[in-house]
Amino acid sequence: MPGFEVIDEKEKKAISRIFDEGKVFFAHGFDKKRKHYHVREFEQKLKTVFSPQVADTLCVSSGTAAIKVALKALGIGRGDQVITQSFNFIATVEAIVDTGATVIFY
């Protein structure tokens, strides 16, 4: 699997610790039970790495959520049209529809 070669013992220990502490989030993100476990720390580190080009950072639970956040940040909403390719994953279309915009297939 591409990418495995960059995972060393430090990363393996961090991942194991998260599993051992029962703080793994799969499909439903950063709920109150998990208290944003490691997420806010990670966001701050990202902000530091990309500063000053990036004013703020936000972690989301899925690619669909990321598309929704990006569309909202751009002010996309009812009355707008968003062009996307027709051969695509359904989440792209769902995110556009969720904003109230109209999907235009390219």
Tell where the protein language model's regions lie, with residue ranges.
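Conserved PLP-binding active-site segment in aminotransferase class I/II-type PLP enzymes
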Residues: 1-72, 77
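PLP-dependent aminotransferase-like
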Residues: 72-106
